[in-house]
């Protein structure tokens, strides 16, 4: 009977998870590594002539703003784009993989890529890792079936919707889209609604911020617009706060000498031939 020479292994290793759980149980007060909170607001909607996608531009590292102008709308095909929320590295590499596969698919078949094909590739890839690839995606594009919009979750589930929003600011964005969305909207009305939805997510979520980027996709092509709107203008300081020495009184002062005790001293001569 034939057997595999090497056992198949997954792309992730969780060997240290049980170790961390044991250490946390044995050593009270131990701070084990925790999952990072990610923040983003991405949205998309279908209008009369195509699809429009939008995203904020803030990238965070826990409570630190790592990038104020992060591009979250990724190219997949000439008429298909994808917004990514979650771990920036995961969304970037996942969309790059999908773009390369669609380029090979177009060269081998001689046909333009379809939005459903891109969505299938993305959800199969994410389902394979069972949610450990932190990428929440909004895929939009125009093909021979007309304008289409999909949302793909990190575990591989997906939905086709006329409008959607994902990320930590999706609550405020979806509320605005549900209230004001109408079928067969004009480009101007759809763009205004999208900017207001992303702005609502930025103003209600600390993980979202920066500018509003948008991508308009029609049968004639796609147009990516960077910094379409700036909801929060940077505020300049009113002045410099430098206080002279002695402004704040010192209430108490205590100096403790640092005493060191030499426990053992060993001197070993080097052997020289």
Swiss-Prot record:
Molecular functions per Gene Ontology: threonine-type endopeptidase activity
Outcome recorded upon mutating residue 40 to A: Prevents the correct removal of the propeptide
Enzyme Commission identifier(s): 3.4.25.1
Site feature location: Cleavage: 39-40
The UniProt record lists the keyword Protease: yes
Active site positions: 40
Modified residues (N-acetylmethionine): 1
GO cellular component: cytosol; nucleoplasm; proteasome core complex; proteasome core complex, beta-subunit complex; spermatoproteasome complex
Keywords, alphabetical: Acetylation, Cytoplasm, Hydrolase, Nucleus, Protease, Proteasome, Threonine protease, Zymogen
SUPFAM superfamilies tied to this protein: N-terminal nucleophile aminohydrolases (Ntn hydrolases)
Function field: The proteasome is a multicatalytic proteinase complex which is characterized by its ability to cleave peptides with Arg, Phe, Tyr, Leu, and Glu adjacent to the leaving group at neutral or slightly basic pH. The proteasome has an ATP-dependent proteolytic activity. This subunit is involved in antigen processing to generate class I binding peptides. Plays a role in determining the T-cell repertoire for an antiviral T-cell response.
Name of the protein in its database record: Proteasome subunit beta type-10
Gene label: Psmb10
């Amino acid at each position: 009977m034939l057997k595999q020479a090497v056992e198949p292994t997954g792309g992730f290793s969780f060997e240290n998870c049980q170790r961390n759980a044991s250490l946390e149980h044995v050593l009270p007060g131990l701070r084990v590594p925790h999952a990072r909170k990610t923040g983003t607001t991405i949205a998309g909607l279908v209008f009369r002539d195509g699809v429009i996608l939008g995203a904020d531009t803030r990238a965070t590292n826990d409570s630190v703003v790592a990038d104020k102008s992060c591009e979250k709308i990724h190219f997949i095909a000439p008429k298909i784009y994808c917004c990514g929320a979650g771990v920036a590295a995961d969304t970037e590499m996942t969309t790059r993989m999908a773009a390369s596969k669609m380029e090979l698919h177009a060269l081998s078949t001689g046909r333009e890529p379809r939005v459903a094909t891109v969505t299938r590739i993305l959800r199969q890839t994410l389902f394979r890792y069972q949610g450990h690839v932190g990428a929440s995606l909004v895929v939009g594009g125009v093909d021979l079936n007309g304008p289409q919009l999909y949302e793909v979750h990190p575990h591989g589930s997906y939905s086709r919707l006329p409008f959607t929003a994902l990320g930590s600011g999706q609550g405020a964005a979806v509320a605005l889209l549900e209230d004001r969305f109408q079928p067969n909207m004009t480009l101007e009305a759809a763009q205004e609604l999208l900017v207001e939805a992303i702005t609502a997510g930025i103003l209600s979520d600390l993980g979202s911020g920066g500018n509003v980027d948008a991508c308009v996709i029609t049968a004639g092509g796609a147009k990516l617009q960077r910094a379409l709107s700036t909801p929060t203008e940077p505020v300049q300081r009113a002045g410099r706060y430098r206080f002279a020495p002695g402004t704040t009184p010192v209430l108490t002062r205590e100096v403790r000498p640092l005493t060191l005790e030499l426990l053992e001293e060993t001197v070993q001569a080097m052997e020289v031939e």
